[in-house]
Amino acid sequence: ISLGNDGDFQDKRFVDIINNDLANTIGNLLNRTSSMSRKWFDNKVPNNEKILSENKLENFAKIAVENYIYNFDNYKLDLAANEVLSLAINTNLYLNDNQPWLLIKEKDNLPLVKEIIYNVLESTRIIGLLLLPLLPELSTKINEQLGSIYREEIPWKKQLIWGLLVSNSSLPKPTPIIN
């Protein structure tokens, strides 16, 4: 849905995009990862062990944030929204590629599992914040699921910095983010 150049903004189409793409991608990602974290780490966000030499998800998130801000600032809301969806898709790929549900079976892998889960939860926090200007209610629901909140006294762009999800913070009981 683009603006300008006779962009076609239709409420039903927008709702369909939100329900199909975001619910299936972001909702499932949040539910899967927070469930793993609650089960394996006593209902808390795990410590980020930082044992991986390169955090590909962090790098991808930084690029997505830069692209989102550029597109949003230039009124290209469709491209900004695509950056959010792209980050969610790549976060899902990261989770599937790293398979923490298999790694957790070996105790020696616990630090790596903590890092993987932290990275996915942190990426999801950023996804939630990126949605704030577009879908504030959905953004709030996502970050509430992470025990994280948008703080109005801190500039929005400063809250998009990687690593601000607080380790060992409690994860609330899950609720659907999209009805």
How would you name each of these model-derived features?
Residues 15-30, 47, 51-58, 74-82, ...:
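Amphipathic, non-membrane alpha-helical segments in soluble helical-bundle scaffolds
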Residues 4-8, 30-68, 88, 92-109:
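Conserved, charged catalytic cores of large soluble enzymes
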Residues 1-52, 149-171, 176:
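Catalytic adenosine-cofactor/nucleotide-binding cores of aminoacyl-tRNA synthetases and other
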Residues 7, 12, 70, 75-76, ...:
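Basic, alpha-helical terminal appendages of large translation-related enzymes
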